[in-house]
Swiss-Prot record:
Tissue localization of expression: By 48 hours post-fertilization (hpf), widely expressed in the brain, with strong expression in the telencephalon and the midbrain.
Residue intervals annotated with topology Cytoplasmic: 840-937
Taxonomic source organism: Danio rerio
Listed name of the protein: Calsyntenin-2
Keywords: Calcium, Cell adhesion, Cell membrane, Cell projection, Endoplasmic reticulum, Glycoprotein, Golgi apparatus, Membrane, Postsynaptic cell membrane, Repeat, Signal, Synapse, Transmembrane, Transmembrane helix
One Pfam entry name: CLSTN_C
Lineage: Eukaryota, Metazoa, Chordata, Craniata, Vertebrata
Length: 937
């Protein structure tokens, strides 16, 4: 027990002595700088301190007491920690405990102290340094891209202005430092734009913008921060160009397409006038359709002059002095022609061409009433003293140089000279009639008609009447026996010169020059002949209201409208239409001009409205294909050719016209894509192929009654017959079916060939050439044999294909069973009985119908009167008469019923076919002997 007490006492004494010794060893506190400045890069952990973190202790090199064991940080949760790198040297380092984000905190300030290791290994009696202030700045990293504050920018500018700033775009950056958070530059990404942008984001235009050129711009803009980091996404900027309020028409199309056959089409359905809110008292708009380059001034029918006069109801008897060159009209062959694509025949005279009209063409009986008409296009005459330019001249052929009548142009005046042979030679009479008109030298087409009712002469130009401004008198011409010469394009000087020649040449273009003796043209006919088939129109006149006034010029190429308010004129302009009534119009452009005058209150004109230039495009029409079809070969007995009525050549002829359509809706036509079209024809020619007709023994004829009720006429020659006039294909079919060929001396004739062709629009569209061949049978036996083989009870038959007769093999006949032979014989006998009964029935029926015809009616188509025949020598006339055969049947009663049905059907045919059929039946019954009672003449 005593030992334990002694031991404890010793330990206590020793520990006390050690404490006294330690206090004597760790005498000094560590020493550090009073302040530190550090920098740490964002997202890094090491802090760069200035000065470096070093603690000193004067107790060194005493172990523990002179060593540094720790650095401690005091602050509000400073995200840093200090670490001793070397206890002896006192070096330390400052690190971040986690990622440092500059965007959250840019600077940190805290307190740091150094601690030595104390006096012993257990750290007892340690000492700490004074407090030092540490200030740390966070260095930014350019980790964010600029971002625009708006997803889209919009602005509106007025055209024609230069802006310093149209709008400003703005971007920002999330980086914390001024270097990386500021936007230093903007850039327009879109290339070739009339815009620029400065470093502050202001967008301006670099040139004057035009609403007509471009109404909207879309550009893309990007931004750069001061570290040259580019925005991840560019921003769109939309800039609208607002037009300067310009007075004028708006909402119209420069081109309007016109489909042929669509009638009236509105030209400006959405058109309206902008006046910029200016007060107005009246508006006047003039719409002009320019068609001077189309045909003869506008789209007109291009039929021949004869066909047009027939169509317009002009009096017959006019002479065409400028017909198309042909074998019979060869005096125009040497003239220059300018036929357009519409087959519109135009003759050009350049001051060196003229034509002598043959004497047989010249009208010889000009009375006190006659008409001269022509289309003329003429410009100013060259030279200071222009000479006379003669269109038409009738002068002495030889010896003298007297002008009996002439039509000429002199110094843009139209002069008509008429000197008559009078009994009273001592009296002055009106001789020269002068008109001074702008139309004569305006280089445009005009239609001139001179109506002579001597001593009065009236001029019509495009349907408008003009009286002469000057009429001069002259002595009458002394009667003489000197022949006269009618010329076109110049005047013939046959006397008073060494060599007869042309003088006073015409320079211009002529078409349709005609002269009609004995009658003058009426206003209605003149208007019809020169009428335009295209023009301006107003749709829905009733919708215009009372606030609009309008009027057309005679050709409907100019429309003038006036209104007191804007709404009325806008409504009226939407109703303006274009119309072309031709079935096959001339395709191409027609120019449109609109001039507008606006009047304000108390002023003449206050707003200037720009002129509008537009166009109508007439699309090409579907070209028709005219097809003539029928029997191409006929066989006739010579006796029929000798008959007074001859034979009808084209009895079963058919004329159709088709057009090819791409529209799928037209597949209901006869063939997919093909549509049958109804239109007029203007002539059909029947020409003789081979030798011309011999007037001594043959002729082509068409009865005048066949043309009655139609707009048709016919002319003939030894080459053929021409049926002309503007009429339907059905009327042409009817007329052609009445063309008859007659040969009263057919002894040496074995065949004749003819060719039929038709035209629409004076040859613009022509048919196929239909060839017909007729064969002549001279013996009655041959006729009976042919007819028997054809099993027909008529002399003539259409031959569609060569007749092939098959001979029955005798071995086959001998092998026929007896029962079959009996049946065949009985059938043949029954057939013979039926045929005989049928022929008798036909004959009796025809006699009854003939009596009824004589009592009740007389067919004008078959009432042949040789005095009224147009003996058109060289034109084909053939008539094909066909009978239906009764079908054979085992039952004789059924055969009788079938035969009766066929006869009833035959009786229901038209009168022409009935009478022709009856003629043939009578001939069969009489065995080639004519039964006069069956003939209709």
């Amino acid at each position: 027990m005593k030992m334990r007490a002694i031991t404890a006492m010793l330990l206590l004494v020793l520990s006390g002595q050690c404490g006294i010794l330690a206090g004597k060893v760790n005498k000094h506190k560590p020493w550090i700088e009073t302040s530190y400045h550090g920098v740490i890069t964002e997202n890094m952990d090491t802090v760069m301190l200035d000065p470096p973190l070093v603690a000193l202790d004067k107790d060194a090199p005493v172990p523990y007491a002179g060593e540094i064991c720790a650095f401690k940080i005091h602050g509000q949760e400073a995200p840093f920690e200090a670490e001793v790198l070397n206890r002896t040297s006192g070096e330390g380092v400052l690190r971040a405990r986690g990622p440092i984000d500059c965007e959250q905190q840019k600077e940190y300030t805290f307190i740091i102290q150094a601690y030595d290791c104390g006096a012993s290994p257990n750290g007892a009696d340690w000492k700490k340094s004074h407090k030092a202030v540490v200030h740390i700045q966070v260095d930014d990293v350019n980790e964010f891209s600029p971002v625009f504050r708006e997803p889209l920018y919009r602005a509106t500018v007025t055209e024609g202005k230069i802006y310093d700033s149209i709008l400003q775009v703005e971007a920002w950056d999330q980086d914390c430092s001024p270097q990386y958070s500021q936007i230093c530059n903007y850039e327009i990404v879109t290339q070739d734009t009339p815009f620029a942008i400065d470093r502050n984001g202001n967008i301006r235009n670099t040139e004057r913008l035009s609403f007509d050129k471009q109404q909207h711009y879309k550009i893309m803009v990007t931004a750069y921060d001061c570290g040259q980091k580019r925005a991840m996404e560019s921003v769109p900027v939309h800039i609208d160009v607002k037009p300067v309020c310009k007075p004028g028409w708006q909402g119209w199309n420069k081109r309007v397409d016109y489909e042929p056959g669509t009638g009236s089409k509105q030209l400006f359905p959405k058109m309206h006038l902008e006046t910029c809110d200016g007060p107005l008292s009246s508006v006047r708009a003039m719409v002009e359709l320019q068609t001077s380059h189309i045909g003869k001034g506008c789209d007109r029918e291009t039929y021949s002059e004869k066909s047009l006069q027939k169509l317009c109801g002009a009096a017959s008897g006019s002479t065409d002095l400028l017909p198309a060159p042909s074998t019979s009209t060869n005096w125009t062959a040497s003239l220059l022609t300018d036929s357009g694509r519409d087959s519109d025949l135009i003759f050009r005279f350049d001051g060196r061409q003229a034509a002598n009209i043959p004497d047989w063409v010249v009208p010889q009986n000009l009375t006190d009433q006659f008409t001269i008409a022509t289309w003329m296009k003429h410009g100013p005459s060259p030279g200071l003293r222009a000479e006379k330019e003669t269109l038409l001249c009738n002068s002495d052929k030889t010896e003298m140089n007297r002008h009996h009548y002439s039509l000429y142009v002199h110094n843009c005046r139209l002069v008509f000279l008429l000197r008559r042979d009078f009994i009273q030679l001592d009296s002055f009479r009106p001789a020269e009639f002068h008109w001074r008109l702008e139309q004569i030298c305006d280089k445009e087409w005009h239609y001139y008609v001179i109506n002579v009712e001597f001593p009065s002469v009236t001029l019509f130009v495009d349907g408008v009447t003009y009286e002469p401004y000057l009429v001069t008198d002259d002595w009458p011409i002394h009667p003489s026996e000197i022949d006269v010469q009618l010329t076109v394009g110049a005047c013939w000087q046959g006397g008073e010169v060494t060599t007869p020649r042309f003088t006073q040449y015409f320079r211009g273009s002529l078409s349709g020059l005609t002269i009609r003796p004995g009658k003058i043209a009426t206003q209605k006919v003149i208007s019809c002949l020169q009428a335009c088939k295209e023009g301006l129109d107003i749709s829905s006149l009733e919708s215009l209201g009372k606030g609009i006034k309008f009027h057309f010029n005679p050709a409907q190429s100019v429309l003038v409208m006036e209104a007191d308010d804007l709404e009325s004129i806008n409504t009226a302009m939407t109703k303006v239409s274009y119309i072309n009534s031709r079935q096959f119009p001339t395709p191409g452009l027609r120019k449109l001009h609109i001039t507008t005058t606006v009047q304000c209150f108390g002023e003449d004109t206050c707003i200037s409205i720009p002129e509008i230039k537009a166009m109508v495009m007439v699309l090409p029409p579907s070209e028709p294909r005219i097809t003539i079809a029928g029997v191409e070969r006929l066989v006739w007995p010579s006796a029929q050719l000798r008959a007074p009525v001859g034979v009808a050549l084209f009895k079963d002829i058919h004329i159709i016209s088709t057009v090819t359509k791409t529209d799928a809706t037209l597949s209901i036509a006869r063939r997919p894509g093909v549509l049958e079209l109804m239109h007029n024809l203007d002539y059909c020619d029947v020409l003789v192929i081979g030798e011309e007709l011999d007037p001594e023994r043959e002729s082509l004829e068409i009865h005048h009654s066949s043309l009655l009720g139609k707009h048709l006429d016919a002319t003939n020659s030894t080459s053929g017959i021409s049926i002309y006039g503007v009429d339907s294909m059905a009327h042409y079919e009817q007329a052609i079916r009445q063309v008859r060929y007659r040969n009263w001396k057919p002894g040496s004739l074995s065949e004749r060939r003819f060719r039929l062709s038709c035209s629409e629009l004076n040859g613009r569209y022509t048919s196929n050439e239909f060839n017909l061949e007729i064969g002549v049978v001279h013996s009655s036996e041959a006729v009976e044999h042919v007819n028997h083989m054809a099993v027909q009870s008529q002399f003539m038959r259409p031959v569609h294909h060569p007749l092939v007769v098959h001979t029955v093999n005798s071995d086959h006949i001998s092998g026929t069973p007896p029962a079959a032979t009996v049946v065949i014989v009985m059938c043949i006998a029954a057939l013979v009985v039926i045929v005989v009964l049928g022929i008798y029935r036909i004959h009796t029926t025809h006699q009854d119908s003939s009596k009824e015809d004589e009592e009740e009616r007389k067919d004008p188509e078959m009432d042949w009167d040789n005095s009224n025949l147009n003996s058109i020598e060289g034109t084909q006339i053939a008539e094909e008469v066909r009978e239906e055969e009764p079908e054979e049947d085992e039952d004789e009663d059924e055969e009788d019923d079938d035969l009766a049905g066929d006869l009833s059907s035959a009786e229901s045919e038209d009168s022409d076919e009935d009478e022709e059929t009856n003629i043939q039946k009578g001939k069969v019954k009489g065995k080639l002997e004519w039964d006069p009672s069956t003939l209709p003449y």
